[in-house]
Amino acid sequence: MKILIASGAGGGTAKGRIGKYFHLKEFGDALEKIDVDYKLVHEFDYITGFPSKSPKGWFSKKKFYDLINEYNPDAVFVDWQSHFALETIKAGIPLFVYLRGHLWMEVESAKKTIYKDLKMRTVLNLRLKNAERVFTNCQGIFMTADYLEDVIKEHIPNARCYHFLEGLDTTRWYPAPGMKLEHPCVGLVVDANMWHKSKEMLVLDEVIQAMPNVHFYWAGDGQYKNKILPVLEKHSNFH
């Protein structure tokens, strides 16, 4: 069996994207252990479609179909509900989709916060419509959390849902010199890629100020870090 895995979530079409590629590589390596062949690609290298930041890719599907004809997969696995998935459905290839979170809540939150203008709200609506077409016509949706099944069924009643368990491969861990922490301290391990979640870090402004003898360390990064760091870095006990 041959599985084509397309990485798109988290990276988008921005230059230098990383997305969730690393985790999908580990998934593919696990498939190889049960004698399943896989090919992992960045989906935006082959097709983008509308709406996206790459107008040149709105109408071109040649790279996508060249990939399909060359690799001839038995099934396709994607982590982004976009045009790669839609074209897979049109090509008649079994499609499986990986859903990491509450997509509908994330879209509504984005409309109320960072994408309030009409243009971006329209883009979000189009992307959500594409995603729902993918969910409706795919062979299965893999979820990272049990609660998502009820969420998905609320919007896509006939969806076929499967639980996808993620794990850590400790053989990949390696020792590294740590930083010297000043005590007492609090460690924050969280990314800054979803604004409706990331904005909660701003409540630390008053907390850090009220606890000058406690050091706060943030281990994280993301597209909204520049909205958070200017607020928190003014405190000498934030690192």
Task: Report the location of each language-model feature.
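Conserved donor-binding/catalytic core segment of Leloir-type glycosyltransferases
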Residues: L4, P177-M201, D205-Q209, Y217
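Membrane-proximal helix-turn-helix segments that form the acceptor-binding/catalytic region
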Residues: K62, D66, L118-I141
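Carbohydrate-associated surface elements
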Residues: Y147, G167
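A short, charged, and often flexible helix/loop element on the N-terminal side
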Residues: L40-L67, Y115-M120
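N-terminal subdomain of nucleotide-sugar transferases
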Residues: M1-F44, E206-Q209
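Short N-terminal targeting/anchoring amphipathic segment
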Residues: D66-H83, T88
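Acceptor-binding helix/loop patch of EC 2.4 sugar-transfer enzymes
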Residues: I47-F50, V97-K129
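Nucleotide-activated donor-binding/catalytic signature segment of Leloir-type glycosyltransferases, i.e.
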Residues: W218, N226-H239
